[in-house]
């Protein structure tokens, strides 16, 4: 008996990387899987390469599982409706949506072109809306659904050159929280994973010029296997995770952590209110001891060891 016996999953962008590993492990645990991948490049360029999705489908079938390929784009709502319908027509229903589809177009903010901003927002944030909006009413009607959204520490903590990606990924956290709140009474859970893994996307990020930093990055990537992320996703997609809802998880190799939601770290009060001068003299010095370091998350995720 697998944890997902009798369940049907749609996995977007799953011809490569984390998505491919999750699709395969879901199938190994009994799920029937719609493997979606439009076959575009790492920046969203091109289209129509059916090889990535079909290859994962073939691997699943060779291992004794059930899967079908889908080549639609998460940027198009009609394509997402078609994914849901394909799951129902082929396998008789839908219970799980996993959302790793993504691209990168990294540039510093002052060099970011509007089209690069919009392309990344469309795939990540709008893509999450499209595929989950296409599935949510079915989930509500049947009183069961598992949604696993994909964010990133670039959104939670910030990262140089990724203002478009980070903005989309933090937006996904807010979207997931609201979807979880609105649908908890309907037997639906919605959680977020922030995976750190060696994939085509992470390899496209420029290597640091400093040799020490470059070597550390390479070692982190070497240890961050994409298949290490899959067990968490299978668990979150299962009935055993029915009481896990609205949470944000980070996983990297053997490390598994949960993030807290935004809340005040420190508060100061002044009778009669504040003036710019009293904020400068009293308010800000008192609050500053709780400031978050502007270090791209290094103080939160210091690095090795990870195993």
Label the predicted regions.
Residues 50, 54, 71-85, 114:
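The beta1-alpha1 cofactor-binding region of Rossmann-like NAD(H)/NADP(H)-dependent oxidoreductases
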Residues 152:
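Residue(s) in the substrate-gating loop at a strand-loop-helix junction
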Residues 5, 63-68, 86-99, 105-108, ...:
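A glycine-rich helix->loop->beta "capping" turn
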Residues 2-35, 40:
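Canonical Rossmann dinucleotide-binding motif of NAD(H)/NADP(H)-dependent dehydrogenases/reductases
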Residues 60, 108-109, 116-121:
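Substrate-binding pocket helix/loop in short-chain dehydrogenase/reductase
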Residues 213-307:
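C-terminal helical subdomain
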Residues 132, 168, 176:
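Active-site helix of classical SDR
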């Amino acid at each position: 008996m697998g944890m997902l016996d009798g369940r049907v999953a749609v996995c977007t962008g799953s011809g490569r990387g984390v998505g491919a590993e999750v699709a395969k492990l879901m199938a190994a645990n009994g799920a029937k899987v719609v493997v979606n991948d439009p076959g575009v490049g790492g920046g969203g360029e091109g289209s129509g390469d059916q090889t990535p999705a079909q290859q994962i489908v073939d691997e699943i079938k060779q291992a004794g599982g059930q899967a079908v390929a889908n080549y639609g784009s998460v940027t198009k709502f009609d394509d997402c409706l078609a994914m849901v319908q394909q799951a129902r027509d082929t396998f008789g229903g839908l219970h799980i949506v996993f959302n790793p589809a993504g691209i990168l177009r990294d540039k510093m903010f002052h060099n970011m072109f509007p089209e690069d901003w919009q392309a990344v927002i469309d795939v990540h944030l709008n893509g999450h809306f499209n595929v989950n909006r296409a599935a949510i009413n079915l989930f509500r009607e049947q009183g069961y659904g598992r949604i696993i959204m994909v964010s990133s520490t670039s959104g939670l903590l910030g990262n140089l050159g990724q203002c478009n990606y980070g903005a989309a990924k933090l937006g996904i956290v807010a979207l997931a929280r609201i979807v979880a709140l609105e649908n908890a009474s309907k037997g639906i859970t919605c959680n977020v994973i922030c995976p750190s893994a060696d994939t085509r996307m992470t390899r496209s990020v420029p290597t640091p010029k400093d040799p020490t930093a470059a070597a550390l990055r390479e070692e982190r990537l070497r240890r961050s296997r994409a298949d290490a992320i899959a067990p968490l996703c299978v668990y979150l997609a299962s009935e055993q995770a029915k009481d896990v809802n609205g949470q944000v998880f980070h996983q990297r190799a053997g490390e598994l952590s949960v993030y807290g939601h935004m809340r005040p770290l420190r508060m100061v009060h002044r009778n009669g209110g504040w003036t710019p001068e009293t904020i400068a003299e009293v308010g800000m010095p008192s609050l500053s001891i709780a400031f978050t370091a502007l270090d791209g998350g290094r103080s939160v995720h210091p690095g090795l060891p990870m195993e």
